[in-house]
Amino acid sequence: MSELHKAFLRRIKEQETALGLSGLVDEDDIPEPAVMPPTGNSSSTANTEDETILRDYKQFKETNFIQEFYENELGHKFKTYYKPSKKPGSILFCHHGAGSSSMTFGNLVNHIEDESVGIFLFDTRGHGESVATSDFSLDTLVQDVSFVLEQFSSKHQQTSIFLLGHSLGGAVLAKYSTLYPSDILKGLILLDIVEEAAVQSLNAMPSFIARRPLSFPSLSKAISWHMNFLLFNEKSARLSVPDLFTDKLTWITDLNATQPYWQTWFSGLSENFLGFKGPKLLMLSTHESLDKQLMIGQMQGKYQLVVFKNNEKSGHFVHEDLPNHVAVCLTDYIKRAVAPEIFMKEDLGVVPKWGGKINK
């Protein structure tokens, strides 16, 4: 077994352990999913806490975004959130992963302080407030991006768009950039997603889904569960978790319904990412995720790599766990891509003495 293969297996084992899973457990040994029982806390206390969480969550949406539904010709509706830039500049077009929603980027939005960067989020089909569907194929998700981005561009004439995708969202945007090349696409950013590691980690998904509670007694308990198993930042969780549940605190997204498409989601991801012509940024929670194609691409200087491997308070949702760190990386990357000479001079204090231009 190669060292690279061993690294992949270690990565998968770490992910299973972090999620409370065991790769040695047979399917017959997996317990039935349970409804999380109520605790000794009084219902009035839980209700008060939930009311506070929901109030802040709704206020955050109303204060920060222009909210719209985009409806395609098939009647599929997509919930969108747009925070315009205060100064002329670029748009960060964000795509979340499977089982998540646009609000996974909520706290990150709070930390992006560059007034020349606008932010656009949307709930992909069957997630958040977008309409449910039975088709979760990669090609369909790419078509959804094409529709949503066309609608957005027709409403808000933009000439500079950076694509940011987390997990599955990264695979969708990487393929979109390959199928729909455009001069307005200035950059491609992937958050904690690598093809080979992603494909292998899918082996743990059935166990993870089977062990999740089917519902929660309160929203605060749902947040606590996420903090115990998936997230490290409660401020982020209070914005992202409410978007995952119905009024009855059951999961909005049926991840089991997506299973037929899992094996195709990440096919060709590394090739699509490296094939993008503009500046590329890959942010990972650990170095062990890099596959052979990305290792070669990194050595050839084809993309920028940022790894948060030394921080124990971050995991797969690195943008939720470390929103300030990720925001700084994003804004620096965008500045450097748009105007490298200005970035070098004003942000780094470096002025090239040879009189030439700095390559992007």
Swiss-Prot record:
Active site annotation, chain numbering: 167, 192, 316
Biological role stated in the UniProt entry: Demethylates proteins that have been reversibly carboxymethylated. Demethylates the phosphatase PP2A catalytic subunit. Involved in the regulation of filamentous growth.
Species per Swiss-Prot/TrEMBL record: Candida albicans (strain SC5314 / ATCC MYA-2876)
EC number(s) reported in the record: 3.1.1.89
Region (Disordered) location: 26-50
Catalysis: reaction(s): [phosphatase 2A protein]-C-terminal L-leucine methyl ester + H2O = [phosphatase 2A protein]-C-terminal L-leucine + methanol + H(+)
Enzyme class: hydrolase
Family in the record: Belongs to the AB hydrolase superfamily.
Pfam families the UniProt entry points to: Abhydrolase_1
Molecular-function annotations in GO: protein C-terminal methylesterase activity
UniProt-listed InterPro entries: AB_hydrolase_1 (IPR000073), AB_hydrolase_fold (IPR029058), PPase_methylesterase_euk (IPR016812)
Cellular component, GO annotation: mitochondrial small ribosomal subunit
Domain of life: Eukaryota
Keyword terms: Hydrolase, Serine esterase
Protein name, entry field: Protein phosphatase methylesterase 1
